[in-house]
Amino acid sequence: MKRVVVTGANGHVGYSVAKLLVARGYDVRATVRDASDPAKTTHLEALGVEIAQADLMRPETLAPVMEGRDGLFQVAAVYRSWARDPQREIIEPSITGGINALRAAHTAGVGRVVFTSSTAAVGRAGPDGAPLSEADWNDASRHPYSYAKTEAEHRAWAFAEESGLDLLVINPTAVIGPDFHRHTPSTAPYRMLLRGELRRIPPITYGLVDARDVAQGHVLAYETRQARGRHILCTECLPAAELVALVRDIDPTIAVPTRQAALWQVRALARLEQFRSWFGREPRLTPETVREYLGKPTSYDTSKARRELGWC
C-alpha cells in the first residue's frame, strides 16, 4: 500500500499531500502536466518524489503513471472562479479529467483512491445557519467552480459504484497555510489584504483549513481501512471582519480596512467587473461569486472526519 500516485502535485493541496506521504515513508509518483517546466517541478524534486508527466484530459498519459501503484490521490482539478469559456476551461476538465483518472486507476488495479472534492460540493450552511454535513449537496449552484466540483464528485461516486472502485472523498473548505507556489482563489484575498488593497471588509464568512491538516485528512483516509464516503475538513468558520481584526492585531502597520461593505455595494462592484471582463480584463469578482458566497452564513459539521479518521 506504500506505492502511490498524487495528481496535481505542484498545487497547494497536492504538494502538501505529497510532502506528508514522503515523510511517512511512501513511494510517491507525482504528476504534473508539464514536467519540463521548472516552476512545476523544482519544489517536487526537493522532496525526492518521482515526477511523471500526465494530463487528465489525455487518458493515454494516465495509464503509464498508474502502473504498479497501490493507491491514487486524485487531487488535480481546475481551481478558478471565472473563465471566458467556463464549460471548456473549468467544468469539463474537472468532470472529465477526474473520471479519466479514476478509470485509469481502476484499469491498472489500483487498490484505493482518495478523491479531492470541496465543500463547494456541499454548500454553505443549512436553514438558519445550521451546519452542513456529508449528507448535503450543492446541487442548485450555477457558480462554475461549485458546479464543477459538485458534478465531478457525483460522477466519481457513480463510477465507483459501477466499477467497484474503493473510493473515499475529502471535502475541504478554503485551504490556507504554507507550501503554495502560486496563489489560489483561497489565498489571493489574503495577499490583497496584506498589501492594503482591500478598501472595505467584504460581507463573507470563510470556512478555513490549513493545507497541512488537509494533507493529514487525505493520508488518514487512505490508511483507515474502515473509512467510507465523504469527509468534510474545516478548522473554523470566520467572518471576514474577524480575520481583518486578527491581521490588525498581528501587525498594526498593515493598512487594513475598517468599514464593512454592504452587500449591494459588492453586487455593484461585481457588475462593474463583469462589464470590464467584456473588454479583456479578468474580473476580480463575479456576480456568480457574490450569489454563491457573500452575505450567507457558513457552517460545517466535521464530526465524521474526527470520529472516523481521527483527524486533527
Show which residues each predicted segment covers.
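Conserved Rossmann-fold NAD(P)-dependent oxidoreductase catalytic core, especially the SDR/UDP-sugar
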Residues: 74, 78, 83-143
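Mid/C-terminal beta-alpha module of Rossmann-like enzyme folds, strongest
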Residues: 3, 217-285, 302, 307-308
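Glycine/proline-rich active-site loop of Rossmann-fold NAD(P)-dependent oxidoreductases
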Residues: 162-166, 177-189, 221-231, 254
